[in-house]
A protein has these predicted regions:
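Alpha-helical support elements that line or immediately flank enzyme active sites
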Residues: 61-78, 386-398, 443, 489-497
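Functionally critical mobile loop/hinge segments
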Residues: 113, 485, 490-592
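Accessory "access/gating" subregions that flank catalytic or transport cores
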Residues: 281-403, 431, 438-476, 584-592
Length: 592
């Protein structure tokens, strides 16, 4: 079974972690801070198909997860009703809602959103997401027009279209926000109930789901509110890894480094071996390409769109205007453009930072608009990894270059090739300078670097999710943007030729200096401070990678220790700083 943070025993504080405190058969993540867990007892690492998922904004825990819950519910409901009437054809949840059988439709469906989902669900479009799932749409493939049209459709017709048929639905009556009720298992909980009769008699199906961050969903399997039992909701391609063997098992960075040392593999190579144990190399590469392409397309879309972001804060999009200014400055160095005369000119040694900021802003503005993005590892932190990937393919490095003690792969054909200024497109990057050609063999090398980046980032993301959390509602923004920064730093260090120890160090630096970040979105929208915070974190990740690459990999604080510290810090953090919009900026900034 794919290991999920929710499946692990509760980790102990650092002072309590000793090998003799755990049963021999347990692979408690925190235990290995003081010793190794045998590979036979270790959990299956999360896959790239788990850590990077294509979905829609603005939140992985409050939008993508609830949408998956709705889709799972409508699929089970369709199967149940099909069994009642002997019609097996009704058991396919992915078919078009228009194909539902009217006679089999329930007379009422109710949705209850608890805890953080109830507190910030309107700003995160949680209600809309659940309805889209119930209508049979998946976050990976739903069209944006469909997303924006679900509320008007229900309001105009009074019905929710589902694979089971048209269900009478009143948005104000049948969706209840219950922020003051926090269920025991997780703060992000929702219950969906289907009734055969409109007056609430004869319940057909009811499930409680927990959206635990990053689009991961757990479903409660019993009715005990005080002792809930849950199972992972496997959806899509990630389901293929359940119970699948993995040649390299690790739940900690200590074990990961041990496996790398024993095998002689780099982190990206080790993760690839695990992936190819259950899929072909072509399938792995195609998925990595799809993830990278979607990230690039998101940057391209964000730099092409203007206007005001939805939600009522009247936050203007900035990426398009910034892209225009930077592109013009890169071409001409024109001093009449807005901004300091030297900024991002060919002579500006910090010009890469402006482009990294642009890439992050573009992605997170798309996310805030509810458009398609890659959960990396969450939607609220979706701009960090694409921005650092942009730095990799735009500014790192010339052939034969070295950074610190690491020997970087050659990404350009010519050792004299200058740093390229680029914009992203559906086919990758478009260079704004004629001095560098990234096609042909150079692009093949660049593609491998991108793949290595994502594979190494997956390893770090798996460690964080396994041992702590990537959900802002559990541990604050340190678990979202902090995790993304650690993943991006590790990916960049790997792509630039870092040793496993340097890669681990890069991730540790980025996470250590993200500790304590609160999640306090104004008006419950993933806009302020989220959009700018992604840009800051992307630059931090680059700095962390560069610092690590100048070292020999030896450092005082381990990645395992900083992940456990992040978990403890999140546990100690007041709930008003964990995606409830009840503290911090959310109460000190006027919503206008």
């Amino acid at each position: 079974m794919t290991f999920d943070a929710a499946d692990s025993p509760t980790a102990l504080p650092l002072a309590q972690v000793t090998p003799d405190r755990f049963d021999a058969g347990e692979a408690t993540p925190a235990a290995v801070l003081s010793g190794e867990v045998p590979a036979s007892q270790a959990a299956h690492p999360l896959s790239i198909f788990d850590m990077f998922r294509i979905g829609i904004g603005p939140s992985s825990s409050h939008t993508v997860g609830p949408m998956r819950a709705g889709l799972a519910f409508t699929g089970e409901l369709a199967s149940l009703l099909a069994g009642d009437e002997g019609d097996e054809a009704a058991s396919t949840p992915q078919r078009s809602p228009e194909e539902g059988a009217e006679s089999k439709a329930p007379c009422r469906i109710m949705i209850d959103l608890f805890g953080s989902l109830g507190a910030t669900g309107r700003g995160h479009n949680t209600d809309r997401a659940v309805l889209l799932g119930l209508a049979g749409y998946s976050p990976e493939s739903v069209e944006i027009d469909t997303v924006e049209g679900i509320f008007p459709t229900i309001a105009a017709t009074g019905f929710l279209p589902t694979p089971c048929g048209q269900v009478p639905f009143d948005i104000a009556r049948d969706i209840r926000f219950v922020p003051r009720t926090v269920l025991k298992y997780h703060v992000n909980a929702l219950t969906i109930t289907a009734w055969r009769e409109a007056d609430g008699h004869e319940k057909i199906l009811e499930h409680t789901y927990y959206s635990v961050g990053g689009g991961f969903v757990m479903v409660q399997t019993n009715d005990d509110v005080d002792n809930p039992q849950v199972a992972s909701l496997a959806t899509g391609m990630s389901a293929a890894t359940i119970d699948a063997p993995a040649p390299f098992l690790f739940t900690t960075s200590a074990r990961l480094l041990h496996e790398c040392k024993q095998s002689g593999l780099r982190i990206s190579e080790l993760v690839r071996r695990n992936e190819e144990a259950v899929r072909t190399a072509q399938e792995v590469d195609e998925y990595l390409d799809a993830i990278a392409d979607t990230m690039f397309e998101c940057v391209d879309a964000g730099t092409s769109a203007s206007g005001i972001l939805p939600g009522g804060l009247d936050v203007p999009r900035r990426a398009k205007a910034l892209s225009t200014k930077l592109s013009e400055r890169a071409r001409t160095g024109c001093e009449s453009l807005p901004g300091a005369p030297w900024a991002s000119s060919p002579d500006d040694p910090m010009r890469a930072m402006d482009w990294v900021n642009l890439f992050a802003l573009a992605v997170n503005e798309e996310n805030a608009a509810g458009h398609r993005i890659v959960t990396a590892p969450t939607n609220g932190a979706a701009g960090v990894i694409p921005a650092v990937l942009g730095y990799l393919v735009s500014y790192c490095p010339e052939a034969g270059a070295t950074i610190g003690a690491a020997s970087a792969p050659a990404l350009f054909d010519s050792p004299e090739a200058p740093l390229a200024r680029v914009r992203f497109g559906s086919k990758g990057v478009e260079v704004l300078s004629d001095a560098s050609d990234i096609r042909g063999e150079a692009w093949a090398r660049r593609r491998k670097a991108v793949h290595d980046f994502l594979l190494a980032a997956t390893a770090v993301g798996s460690l964080i999710k396994t041992n702590a959390s990537i959900a802002g509602a559990e541990v604050g923004c340190q678990g979202e943007v902090g995790s993304a920064a650690a993943m991006a730093a590790a990916g960049l260090a790997e792509a630039l030729g870092g040793t496993p120890e340097q890669v681990e160090n890069a991730a540790e630096i980025a996470m250590e200096h993200s500790l304590g970040l609160t999640c306090d979105p104004i008006a419950g929208l993933v806009q302020i401070p989220c959009i700018e915070r992604n840009a800051i974190a992307a630059v931090k990740a680059i700095n962390a990678a560069r610092m690590a690459l100048w070292s020999d990999g030896r450092h005082t604080v381990s990645l395992d220790a900083v992940i456990e510290t992040m978990r403890q810090t999140g546990n100690d953090m007041l709930s008003k700083y964990k995606e409830t919009s009840a503290g911090g900026l959310a109460v000190n900034v006027v919503e206008c």
